[in-house]
């Protein structure tokens, strides 16, 4: 069960308009580093006293709420540190933009704390998934939807760039 929806954004002046709208609508938010996404998420988790993060990124407009619930339930019940949609149970495929567009990532704050201690750079503005997928101490789980991946490989369901 999701307890809080928190918008995490940056301290940059360009996000001031967003924060003003969030305040007017009484929506919880947290502002942090524009370069260190991992630290921003960790600081938000500590501020709001949560132990699990389900990351529905702003560029993932087709995220399926049923998968949000599934990710949350698995993280609460299983000894898993990181969960993500994927086209395989074995190895993470960063190029599968269909599955990544509908299934959010989720992770335990305890794993995020350990990654923040071990990371060598504070610049991870392009994402954090590789930190979780590349570290052996992280217990990973991939949700593999029952779909025809030969068709979905051609479909991109996230909005990372203007051409998307």
Locate the predicted segments by residue.
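Short phosphate-binding loop-to-helix
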Residues: 12-76
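N-terminal glycine-rich phosphate-binding loop and ensuing alpha1 helix
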Residues: 1-14
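Short, structured coil segments at secondary-structure junctions
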Residues: 1, 25-26, 136
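Conserved beta-strand segments of alpha/beta enzyme cores
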Residues: 4, 28, 139-141
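An accessory alpha-helical subdomain
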Residues: 156-163
């Amino acid at each position: 069960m999701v307890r809080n929806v928190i918008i995490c954004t940056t301290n940059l002046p360009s996000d001031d308009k967003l924060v003003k709208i969030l305040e007017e609508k009484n929506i919880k938010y947290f502002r942090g580093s524009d370069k260190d996404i991992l630290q921003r998420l960790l600081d938000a988790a500590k501020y709001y006293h949560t132990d699990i993060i389900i990351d529905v990124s702003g560029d993932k407009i087709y995220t399926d709420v049923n998968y949000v619930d599934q990710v949350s339930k698995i993280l609460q019940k299983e000894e898993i540190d990181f969960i993500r949609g994927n086209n395989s149970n074995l190895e993470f495929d960063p190029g599968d933009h269909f599955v990544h567009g509908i299934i959010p990532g989720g992770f335990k704050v305890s794993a995020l704390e350990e990654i923040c201690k071990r990371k060598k750079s504070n610049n991870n503005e392009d994402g954090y998934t590789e930190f979780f997928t590349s570290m052996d101490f992280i217990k990973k789980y991939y949700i593999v939807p029952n779909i025809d991946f030969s068709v979905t490989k051609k479909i991109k369901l996230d909005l990372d760039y203007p051409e998307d």
